[in-house]
């Protein structure tokens, strides 16, 4: 096996030219009793998994400085080598995550106590000095030379072991992951919490060096509104009393330090490793992935960007229709960047635990929607429950089994069921990966808005609310409305997207705050001029990135939006009724601004609050209110989305008579989703094919359309194909007891697990099946 390679085509990984779907689960060997390892790994294989993922905890394997145990001499659960050999014996691939930091609800995130105690200077600092030593993840100054020195020593011990078990050396390790979610131990979410370590803030320290590298003094005077004779006069901001551009620069500076840190680790790992090197969610932000993409591209780092999906934490798992907007957004922005990096998309932490209970239908909704939206490689976290060794616990005391698919005692929990069948579908229908998701509509993200939303900071002079969680990303947000209106969308970064990339979309939605860079405003102008259809709400920007007046977009559109302050206290906001043609009293929240100019399309009484402007070859819809998701009998909000599509001539790729059936087109497959736990039925038209569908409860079907499977040319099937053999197809339909199969030639010779109930037409068969799975021989 020596010399075998792990390669990829940007969608899937290939092991010696054989494309595979990475379908794995997390078993942290150091938390599971040694004598359970084989049983748990065999159970994982029986669930259809082909990969096991694990951290390697630095402080577990080096409990005292210079004293290492990788063979279990001091504790059987330190036998890393034995674990790797067992996984290989059982035919499982391995993804390994050796830190230095692993997070993982583990003591110090894996950083040894002895290192912190002997070198407290490596700890990050607040503006007021040191943090309490007992915080669960003591934040480290990533670029402190002492920390880097010890991190490299750790790597020099663990990486030779990893090298021996690489797939390319005859082992089973197919990827090595750098650190874990390098986000300053999640304090990046609070702009002034870290890092004021001396090596950063001292005169001519890292902060001043970064400013010199990125700005002239003249640029900084323009941005900060002050005069400077030297960079050393510019102290890091410590509160929101500083100019917003300076606070944003401090935020981006810390992101840059993370990137620098990741580069140092990457270069060390690459000395030992020739398989893909990966990184999970840099910064734990989304739009800020722009900074990661630009950095690794500039430095020519071959790092595979991976992501994660969590929808509860130590509470009952809750993934229903109102989470679809956020899911569409996160998968969209992730697809955008991995397509630019040209590496396979992979969710390394797909939530399968850390919840009081996970209902199998809600688990199915999340697990099936990820591949439907372009993430075909999945790892379920945490797949196998365990216990924390004494002295290494963090959040959980002794327990590390919080409703994992396989419990500490070996029991298999209910959400194993969707994990099994989704894996069967993905592995038996590799061509699904090549039937790519491509939307006609995009949401345009402007990265600086993410930080303001994250911090909850609205400059006093701003008029629009920065609460994007409520109005955009959240359960009632605009993006959930688009998802539930059957408007599948991509996400693009407005700062780095080219005009050509933007024009691939018939329509782009933009949520605007008070400011937007002059360059982005110019791009949106060009997009409309060249035939694009813009929807922008709930205001138009009137400031540029330096918070200086800039009304280029407003001037081009010839539209004035009323200057009215949104209210931030949710108890003090008004509820208003908007009318439009065919729309009677659609409720909107917070202030609604008058829009002057263009053709009126929405109003409150005599006040116009929405218009359409036709410019050049395209158009723009300007709304002075926040369009959100409300589900009701009258369903005004989804009807208003329909109206906007119609006004701008944007047609859906799929027609569904029942709008509660969500359709995601994938060329030769159509993913149908019932996000609600009630029966839905309707007619579907797609690619010249029309059929009826019934879904008795919450769940997902992968419908093949005009595709050949196992030598059978299907016109369509209202069930999910999950395997079979030559001219045999195994199907699964758990949402109805009848399924419709249409074929181009031949006939059905037999049905195992069901029977032909009716022949509706030439080669169109209705199958009644007693069980959820049935197999047809053609």
Swiss-Prot record:
Cytoplasm listed as a keyword: yes
Active site annotation, chain numbering: 181 (proton donor), 349 (nucleophile)
Activity's dependence on pH: Optimum pH is 6.
Effect in UniProt of substituting residue 181 to Q: Retains 10% of wild-type activity
Compartments where located: Cytoplasm
GO molecular function annotations of the record: 2-acetamido-4-O-(2-amino-2-deoxy-beta-D-glucopyranosyl)-2-deoxy-D-glucose exo-beta-D-glucosaminidase activity; beta-galactosidase activity
Listed InterPro entries: Class_I_gatase-like, GLMA, GLMA-like_C, GLMA-like_second, Glyco_hydro_42_N, Glycoside_Hdrlase_35, Glycoside_hydrolase_SF
Residues reported to bind substrate: 55, 104-105, 180-181, 308, 349, 381
Keywords: Cytoplasm, Glycosidase, Hydrolase
GO cellular component terms, A-Z: beta-galactosidase complex; cytoplasm
Subunit structure: Homodimer.
Record function comment: Exo-type enzyme that specifically cleaves the non-reducing terminal glycosidic bond of chitooligosaccharides. Catalyzes the hydrolysis of GlcN-GlcNAc to glucosamine (GlcN) and N-acetylglucosamine (GlcNAc). Involved in chitin degradation. Can also hydrolyze chitosan and chitooligosaccharides of various chain lengths.
Entry-linked NCBIfam families: exo_beta_glucsam
Protein name (database record): Exo-beta-D-glucosaminidase
Species name: Pyrococcus horikoshii (strain ATCC 700860 / DSM 12428 / JCM 9974 / NBRC 100139 / OT-3)
Lineage: Archaea, Methanobacteriati, Methanobacteriota, Thermococci, Thermococcales
Gene (name only): glmA
